[in-house]
């Protein structure tokens, strides 16, 4: 059986699982893992096929969620960034008894633009899939540059993301394509109306991948959830605003 790479740090009485985004790995959390592990029992995970979780092909969202759950604590706060937000949301939908609270970061229940729904144009995602076959390292780097564009610290934030990617072997092209397919096709807007656990959604005002226009739309669709926008962040608020980010999670811990 293929194994998910999993690291546990800290000894807090609440478990917190962090799920990274497309093309990346758990090293992306190194800017906040020391701070968070002083408040939580922290679980860092490489999603199947990414980072050190080798031997997986392209998976559906449901299969990715089930693979991650195999090694997870019985109950935890699940936090997912970008693509990881869809994985955490899927777990909240299928195994609500395992989810103490759900946190999504710069994530959308439907990344792809639809009628009257802001998102990434489908042809942009299809273009990324095509370019992966031609020059996948450059394509991943372009995607990372998009994630930090517009912030005051854009250049150093992009460098931090690139360093994370290059620290470990690149994922296989079919795994990267599978992740883009999830971003292109999945729509959890309606299902997530039914989750009852505490649900916190974090966004960057300058995010070029998850438009801030979705925030009030989801506030209305999911009145049981809470949203917070980092005024000067883009797609990676935990890199550009680590102290503020950790503060929000510690405050959530007091409420669950």
UniProtKB/Swiss-Prot annotation:
**Claim: Hydrolase is one of the keywords in the record:** yes
Q: Which reaction does it catalyse?
A: 6-carboxyhexanoyl-[ACP] methyl ester + H2O = 6-carboxyhexanoyl-[ACP] + methanol + H(+)
Pfam families given in the database record: Abhydrolase_1
Annotated AB hydrolase-1 domain ranges read: 15-242
Chain sites annotated for binding substrate: 22, 82-83, 143-147, 235
Q: What does the pH dependence annotation say?
A: Optimum pH is 8.0-8.5. The activity is more than 90% in the pH range from 7 to 9.
Q: State the source organism's domain of life.
A: Bacteria
**Cysteines engaged in disulfide bonds, as pairs:** none
Q: Which GO terms describe its molecular function?
A: carboxylesterase activity; carboxylic ester hydrolase activity; pimelyl-[acyl-carrier protein] methyl ester esterase activity
Q: Name one GO cellular component term.
A: cytoplasm
- What residues sit in the active site? 82 (nucleophile), 207, 235
Report the EC number(s), separated by commas if there are several: 3.1.1.85
| Pathway(s) the chain acts in | Cofactor biosynthesis; biotin biosynthesis
Query: Which InterPro entries would you find in this protein's record?
Result: AB_hydrolase_1, AB_hydrolase_fold, BioH, Carboxylesterase_BioH
Which Gene Ontology BP annotations are present?
A: biotin biosynthetic process
| SUPFAM superfamilies documented for this protein | alpha/beta-Hydrolases
The listed locations are:
Cytoplasm
Activity control note: Strongly inhibited by phenylmethylsulfonyl fluoride (PMSF).
Temperature-related activity data read: Optimum temperature is between 20 and 30 degrees Celsius.
- Is this entry keyworded Cytoplasm? yes
Null allele outcome, as annotated, is: Cells display no detectable hydrolysis of the thioester and no trace of DMB-S-MPA.
Any idea which UniProt keywords this protein has?
A: Biotin biosynthesis, Cytoplasm, Hydrolase, Serine esterase
Q: Name the family.
A: Belongs to the AB hydrolase superfamily. Carboxylesterase BioH family.
Q: How does it assemble?
A: Monomer.
The free-text function statement in the UniProt record for this protein reads:
The physiological role of BioH is to remove the methyl group introduced by BioC when the pimeloyl moiety is complete. It allows to synthesize pimeloyl-ACP via the fatty acid synthetic pathway through the hydrolysis of the ester bonds of pimeloyl-ACP esters. E.coli employs a methylation and demethylation strategy to allow elongation of a temporarily disguised malonate moiety to a pimelate moiety by the fatty acid synthetic enzymes. BioH shows a preference for short chain fatty acid esters (acyl chain length of up to 6 carbons) and short chain p-nitrophenyl esters. Catalyzes the hydrolysis of the methyl ester bond of dimethylbutyryl-S-methyl mercaptopropionate (DMB-S-MMP) to yield dimethylbutyryl mercaptopropionic acid (DMBS-MPA) during the biocatalytic conversion of simvastin acid from monacolin J acid. Can also use acyl carriers such as dimethylbutyryl-S-ethyl mercaptopropionate (DMB-S-EMP) and dimethylbutyryl-S-methyl thioglycolate (DMB-S-MTG) as the thioester substrates.
Provide the protein name.
Pimeloyl-[acyl-carrier protein] methyl ester esterase
Species for this entry: Escherichia coli (strain K12)
Gene symbol here is: bioH
